[in-house]
From Swiss-Prot:
Residues 65-73, 155-187, 366-383, 477-479 are extracellular. Heterodimer with conventional odorant receptors (ORs). Belongs to the insect chemoreceptor superfamily. Heteromeric odorant receptor channel (TC 1.A.69) family. Orco subfamily. This is Odorant receptor coreceptor. Residues 1-43, 95-133, 209-344, 405-455 are cytoplasmic. Odorant coreceptor which complexes with conventional odorant receptors (ORs) to form odorant-sensing units, providing sensitive and prolonged odorant signaling and calcium permeability. Orco is a universal and integral part of the functional odorant receptor, involved in the dendritic localization of other olfactory receptors. Required for detecting a host for blood feeding. Plays a key role in preferred attraction of females for humans over non-human hosts for blood feeding. InterPro entries: 7tm6_olfct_rcpt. The gene is Orco. Glycans are attached at residue 167. Its main location: membrane.
Length: 479
């Protein structure tokens, strides 16, 4: 099958660097490609098989070395660490259609001419933050892989073995490899050793990048959502000033249509002396589906008119028909854009909620075992650095989810405050009703949950961190 190149829009275009990296590291995302898909599918399946073979080798080492408690704990931590990568790799493959649907929600970024400047500005802010997040996470991942491989050459390459006959623990030399694994060949030296080393280096880089790139896409969705909420809050005050022109006398109505887009000094609407042809007013840029606008044109009574009996314009501010339609469509734009954001948040939760649940279940067990291992640190040696590295990396992964989930809660809950803080009392009756509805709808903050079991926020991170610290202190006291 050969896919022709297409022009991308919306979130797909914004997240294209992330998507290309995910495809490069073997993720099963074949929709946004050009050229033969069969080769990409074979490449993804080859990566999956190689990742699973190494993961099974790690699990085999865990099963074969259960005699010593310290060795068992260390091998369990390593297995759980790479469980994140395997589960997310398979999760993205199984739920690829959900990823496509979420990415496609914003494929038609319709805007309003009055607020186009504000929309473009917050979109550029979101794009810059998403690119910065991607670069930071990828650099951190590569540095972590380099550090992991480097520390392999320090210290003794041994493992603890428990002798049941003598009830003693002794050390056995093992291959100096980044990861303890069980292979069907002797990897102590020669070609098998070099092959095993290169294989594990590949496994480290690809598995960690596969997991982190999926997490970055999730966080990028939340970043984009938060900036859209910022845009909606930013245009609330100009929206109220616009609505006030419908039925409230204002001395300088011509100035009303200036600086309506977050401080812009550009004139947005010309105050024409005579009514323009209403056909010149194009509504296609403002959520132009028939379901949105058809009801209004079928029921003209929903639009107020200001013409007197003589057919003259009776609007107290002298607004033309075009300006009246523009003002009314601004309120509709805000509502439809907010509903669009709500749909995006719902799709994000459905797409990645189960992955968050699996991540937190694995991390809870892993962090508990790391707290136990941390009690045995007596010096800043290879063992101490390894445990600290595991601990910091695991907490950073959880923090990455929680910080963006918490920001979504803050931004969505502050929409009601922004609506109440604007000059709604100077607006039209329609605007006052609009603000009342906004306050009612935004009382409950938007959240992302882990398959309905927990809410992703800083409170979750504080709970996890508090549990780890508490367990660590208890173990120190028992020791």
């Amino acid at each position: 099958m050969h896919v022709q190149p297409t022009k991308y829009h919306g979130l797909v275009l914004d997240l294209m660097p992330n998507i290309r990296l995910m495809q490069g590291f073997g993720h099963f995302l074949f929709r946004y490609v050009s050229g033969p898909v069969l080769i990409r599918k074979l490449y993804s399946w080859w990566n999956l098989i190689m990742i699973l073979l190494q993961y099974f080798a790690i699990m085999g080492n865990l099963v074969m070395n259960t005699g010593d408690v310290n060795e068992l704990t260390a091998n369990t931590i390593t297995t759980l660490f790479f469980t994140h990568s395997v589960t997310k790799f398979i999760y993205v493959a199984v739920n690829s259609e959900h990823f496509y649907r979420t990415l496609g929600i914003w494929n038609q970024p319709n805007s309003h001419s009055l607020f186009a400047e504000s929309d473009a500005r917050y979109h550029s802010i979101a794009l810059a933050k998403m690119r910065k997040l991607l670069v930071m996470v990828m650099v951190t991942t590569v540095l972590s892989v380099v550090a992991w491989i480097t520390i392999t050459f320090f210290g003794d390459s041994v493992k603890n073995v428990f002798d049941k006959e003598t009830n003693e623990t002794y050390t056995v030399e093992i291959p100096r490899l980044p990861i303890k694994a069980l292979y069907p060949w002797d990897a102590m030296s020669g070609v098998p050793y070099f092959f095993s080393f290169v294989y594990q280096a590949y496994f480290l880089l690809f598995s960690m990048c596969q997991a982190n790139l999926a997490d970055v896409m999730f966080c990028s969705w939340l970043l984009f959502t938060c900036e859209q909420l910022q845009h909606l809050k930013g245009i609330m005050r100009p929206l109220m000033e616009l609505s006030a022109s419908l039925d409230t006398y204002r001395p300088n109505s011509a100035a009303l249509f200036r600086a309506a887009s977050a401080g812009s000094k550009a004139e947005l609407i010309l105050n024409e002396e005579k009514d323009p042809d209403t056909k010149d007013f194009d509504l296609n840029g403002i959520y132009n589906s028939k379901a949105d606008w058809g009801a209004q044109f079928r029921a003209p009574s929903t639009l107020q008119t200001f013409n007197d009996n003589n057919g003259m314009n009776g609007n107290p501010n002298g607004l033309t028909k075009k300006q009246e339609l523009m003002v009314r469509s601004a309120i509709k734009y805000w509502v439809e854009r907010h509903k669009h954001v709500v749909r995006l948040v719902s799709a994000i939760g459905e797409t990645y909620g189960a992955a968050l649940l699996l991540h937190m279940l694995t991390s809870t067990i892993k962090l508990t075992l790391l707290a136990y291992q941390a009690t045995k640190i007596d010096a800043l040696n290879v063992y101490g650095l390894t445990v600290i590295g595991y601990l910091v990396y695991a907490l950073a992964q959880v923090f990455l989810f929680c910080i963006f989930g918490n920001r979504l809660i803050e931004e969505s809950s502050s929409v009601m405050e922004a609506a109440y803080s604007c000059h709604w009392y100077d607006g039209s009756e329609e605007a006052k009703t609009f603000v009342q509805i906004v306050c009612q709808q935004c009382q409950k903050a938007m959240t992302i949950s882990g398959a309905k079991f927990f809410t992703v926020s800083l409170d979750l991170f504080a709970s996890v961190l508090g549990a780890v610290v508490t367990y660590f202190m208890v173990l120190v006291q028992l020791k």
